[in-house]
Amino acid sequence: MSAHAQAKKAIAFVDGQNLFAAARDAFGITTASYGVAALSQAIAAQRGWEVAEVRFYTGVPERHDNPGLRFWWTARLRRLRADGVAVTARPLRRRRKRARLDDGRQLEFDVLEEKGIDIRIALDVVRAVLERQCDVVLLFSQDQDFAELAREVRRIAARQRRWVDIASAYPVGSGTRNSRGVDGTDWIRVDRGLYDACLDERDSRP
């Protein structure tokens, strides 16, 4: 945490799909069973911050694409809301992708992509800083698209004559391919011990 920050009120902004992808690569997990509130509180406690709010953002598959996973996410988001987490969900849309193999052949495949989550997170962060809702932005993501957001947070804070810390938190383990946080933020690496200590056991898939 930066020495410039005096107040410690933090809002956690959790990019659910990005956090899951990082945990999958780092630890080999197959289910998004992270406890977002517990993880936010644990990181804040290590740094002397007080968590004012946790906001969770994710894409959810359509019923016709994956009914089982949609049911799981619907139940998961319902529990998060009951726990006081602010939830923003967007549909995952199927997109056709093409890739060229080393031997020159072209491969076509379908992927599910979320649209609008990054923009929603950025808008909510800017609004929170403009309205002085927090002194620390705790961003669970490695998405470099947020580097410009970090610069904007600094500009807003400078105009307000205060310091706002912005940190990106993400899992790092033996399988991690990208160990960088968002440029322009403080990087908080989440190890397997901390990640496992904050699991939401209610989310275990049968």
Residue ranges and their predicted role:
Residues 1-110, 169:
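Domain-level signal for Mg2+-assisted phosphodiester chemistry and nucleotide/NA-binding surfaces
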Residues 87-206:
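Nuclease catalytic cores that cleave nucleic-acid phosphodiester bonds
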